[in-house]
Structure formats: C-alpha cells, structure tokens
C-alpha cells in the first residue's frame, strides 16, 4: 500500500533471513489483486514486486504460483454470469491450461451427449447457454510411477440449484458457487 501511495511501479523487497518466502510471495501477489474492472476504480500503480528471497527462491516461486492461481479463481468468480458463461469459461480454461503446458479438451453439448453426460445436459437445459466440460491433463515426459492423481473441480458459472429455497438476498451470491 505504501508503494501504491508513492506511485511506485516496481518494488523490490529484501527478505530477512528466517522469513517465510512462500508466504511473503503469496501476500504480495494477493495484495496486487484488483477486481475485474466492473466498478470504477483507480488503476493500481504497482506493476511488479520483486522478492529477493535469499536461500529460499524455490519457496518464493511456489508462493507466487499458488497466489496467481488463487487470484485467477478470484477474478473468474468476480465476472458476472452474463459475461462468463460456460463457453467463455471453457475458452479461458483452455487458454490458461495451454499456457501452463497442459493438454486441453473442451466437450460441447454434442460431445457430452456422445459420452452419456445426461445429467450435465439436463441441468444445462435450464439455460440458453449450453454446458461445457473441460478436461485439463498433465502427462509427464518421464513418469517415475504408474500412480495417477485426479483433481476434479466444477466451473458452474451460475448455480440455480435450490433456487426456490434461497431468499432473494441470496440470489446475487449464486455466481460464487464456481469458487468452490
């Protein structure tokens, strides 16, 4: 905040020995997050924070990756459902996945029908915007084991499940369901 007040565009922070470089990196990146631009706001002057992590650069890198992922999730949740429907979400997931070196597959309603995803298609019939399913896969070049790890998340851009059970004041928060 002090750097922003001073209108600094770049800030370097020397971390004292014993400082948790991962947490410092996370905090710096979380602090730089700004909403997606749907409200009038002054531009954030700080464009870059450099952490001089001494003996823990790998931990700082880990914190950076974690915080950037969380800020991406925050950004997606902030986008109104009329601007981020299933197709837009799938396109963004494909862009982010490809940039991270992942294999990306996007299944449209035809592919979903072919795979027998009737429940997903049935829920999608409640919208004029058809559903999408995104598969992001990481396949290492030289795997050291036959073990597999699966992470499953949902990118429901606006969850109307239980709509009749929610009070009117709860309607605006239904878009946050995609955040987990």
What are these regions (language model features)?
Residues 1-157, 165-170:
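N-terminal hydrophobic/helix-forming segments and targeting peptides
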Residues 163-180:
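Acidic/histidine-rich catalytic neighborhood of metal-dependent amide-processing enzymes
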